[in-house]
Design a protein with these regions (language model features):
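FAD-site-proximal beta/loop scaffold in flavoenzymes
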Residues: 111-130, 216-289
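Beta1-alpha1 glycine-rich phosphate/pyrophosphate-binding loop at the start
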Residues: 1-66, 143-172
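Rossmann-like NAD(P)H-binding beta-loop-alpha module
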Residues: 125-155
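A Rossmann-like FAD-binding core segment of flavoenzymes
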Residues: 65-76, 80-81, 88, 154-252, ...
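FAD-binding core/adjacent interface of flavoenzyme oxidoreductases
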Residues: 2-3, 63-133, 211, 222
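A conserved FAD-binding loop/helix module that cradles the flavin
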Residues: 265-319
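Glycine-rich, N-terminal phosphate-binding loop of Rossmann-like dinucleotide-binding domains
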Residues: 9, 97-98, 225-226
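C-terminal auxiliary extensions adjacent to catalytic cores
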Residues: 314, 319-365
């Protein structure tokens, strides 16, 4: 049986590994001891009890393949190199190293216990503060404003964004729907407002953003300035380039620099999709089908190239019952409101789904 090595145990890497588990000898390599369902970490800021269900062991993910804990320092079309110098050979290598984000929305290192401890500490700090400022008008900042204002309606929440509307890169209609709901929850929106100096860009802090913002007291500040692709592992490959977002440039079949039998997907890869779970639902089925055909002897050039979603889809809950979303269907997408957003994501944040995919029922032990 052909050997497939997947580097990175996030959403893309685990989904692809599961999809190929029955047709290849799959080895998934990940530095962390548990899968971090970081989509739910935003609500974890107001409800840290979620931690019992969003830090999920890898042991039950694959039936035939293997999940190995280790740090990958080198990749090629023939295999990978681990930090201890061990080399693992493979017939196909897929890199899905994902992206980084400020704490407490993603781990800052490989220790999942440290991530859990920090999220609990941030929650305790949040409960003690009356004034909250969120810097960043993208999905994380918008969702966080919705979660805090829903769970703590008595707190003063201000969302600061340098853009003229929320959710840059998406439709004005979506931005308007989310802005109206946030204002209805009492959130103050400060658009077209740049914050040039932050005490930290990587974790929450207590400090002023400037008197011009009119903060009533010194706020707890959450930086939510966007994801940063993790691409260092590609830099040793000759000819590999990065796009303006820092994502690895790929050919039509998701190969960096056209390297034979080396593929990339997810947040680190310039696929033409945004860095969202919605994007993964298109990339993984395509790559799984493509690699299955290759493993059966089909030449890659005879297979259809990857095509990103024609419309940027995204699900943006504002707490368990509110929010708005764009579904990547039809030519221009379909925008849906509170009920559909709650049903698709807001109520459960995919927690039961990922527990089930990893072999658990209600909690990960």
């Amino acid at each position: 049986m052909k050997r497939v090595i997947v580097v990175g145990g996030g959403y893309a890497g685990t989904a692809l590994s599961r999809a190929l588990d029955g047709v290849a000898d799959v080895q998934l390599v990940e530095a962390r001891d548990r899968f971090v369902h970081n989509v739910a970490a935003i609500r974890g800021v107001v409800d840290p009890s979620l931690l019992d269900r969003i830090l999920i062991p890898y042991g039950r993910l694959l039936r035939r393949g293997r999940v190995r804990q280790g740090t990958v320092t080198g990749v090629s079309a023939r295999g990978i190199t681990l930090a201890d110098g061990e080399q693992i050979e493979g017939d196909i290598v897929v890199v899905a190293t994902g992206s980084r984000y400020a704490s407490p929305f993603k781990p800052q290192g490989d220790a999942t216990q440290a991530f859990a401890d920090e999220l609990r500490a941030v929650h305790a700090h949040l409960e003690s503060m009356d004034t909250i400022a969120i810097v960043g008008g993208g999905a994380v900042g918008v969702e966080l404003a919705g979660e805090i204002s829903t769970a703590y309606p008595g707190k003063a929440v201000t969302l600061v964004a340098g853009s003229s509307s929320l959710m840059p890169g998406y439709s004005g209609k979506l931005a308007e729907a989310l802005a109206a709901q946030l204002r209805g929850k009492g959130v103050s929106l400060r658009l077209n407002t740049r914050v040039d100096t932050l005490a930290s860009r990587d974790r929450p802090f207590v400090g002023s953003l400037g008197t011009s913002l009119g903060e009533a007291g010194t706020p707890l500040v959450f930086p939510a300035l966007g994801a940063r692709p993790v691409t260092a592992i590609f830099q040793q490959i000759p000819g590999v380039g990065l796009d303006r977002q820092g994502r690895v440039v790929l050919d039509a079949w998701l190969r960096p620099a056209g390297v034979r039998n080396l593929f990339a997907l997810g947040d680190a890869a310039a696929t033409g999709d945004p860095m969202t779970i919605v994007a993964i639902t298109r990339q993984v089925p395509w790559l799984s089908k493509t690699l299955t055909a290759m493993l059966a002897g089909r030449p890659l050039a005879s297979l259809p190239p990857y095509r990103p979603w024609p419309m940027r889809g995204i699900l943006v809950p504002l707490g368990p019952r509110d929010g708005a979303s764009v579904l990547p269907v039809l030519r221009n997408g379909v925008q849906v409101g509170k009920w559909a957003t709650a049903l698709l994501k807001g109520r459960e944040l995919f927690v039961p789904r990922y527990l089930k995919e990893f072999g658990y029922d209600r909690a990960a032990q």
